[in-house]
């Protein structure tokens, strides 16, 4: 199948390649974007980093064709269904169990990179940051595209990784009482129509200010964009030294999110010399996806037991 970069290149350069009047984007950018293919996105029911605006892959698929041992399953390009079950929904995420995906049609959107508006904020604590993101998602003024909230431990790593540490921004944060291992980073973008992108960013800034968010401009988001697909490459190098890095996620309602975050982190940190970075992405008005990234030295058996413990903590806390 076609890879993510090849698909985006074809869509972005559609006027030159296909004679269209407009440029397009698929809007789907998973962390594996550089080496994954469209078929892989569909059969694993993937989510991209811009999903809060464009939707996940199940929101982008129009129709599909699968080859099975008993025949071909082919859905049509209908805009909606009046009856169920929805065959597209059943097949997406089946990972080859129900058949082999051979063809699919995806939605595309007009590509308007000139309208992208970047923003980032530092909050004094996790709860203020959660309150702000929840209000933004329930504000009914439209959704951001990239939208990512890091907890205190991940924020400390981000301060170094994105070149914030030691800058004038860092010094101002310290003067204003934003403390290490308490402050949280929110970064994101708005896009689409120019008026919408500007209005959405303005609304987001107003809400973040209400919850004591310190505006750190689009500089941090640009730094994140520079390495947004690079983390998977680090995994293999770390494993050569016996250091394992993995990610587990769960979808959590706003009401129970603080408890799930607290309980799972307590388990993760119960293992000595283990880093546990947590962030929220793929936001919805009712909930968000909580990601736990753990890094530590462990063998295969220890990893399996540790992973099971994290899953148990997720289930018990939520």
Regions found by a protein language model. Name each.
Residues 314-318:
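Short, intrinsically disordered, charge-balanced linker/junction segments flanking boundaries
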Residues 2-148:
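FAD-binding subdomain of flavoenzyme oxidoreductases
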Residues 130-313:
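C-terminal substrate-recognition/cap domain of FAD-linked oxidoreductases
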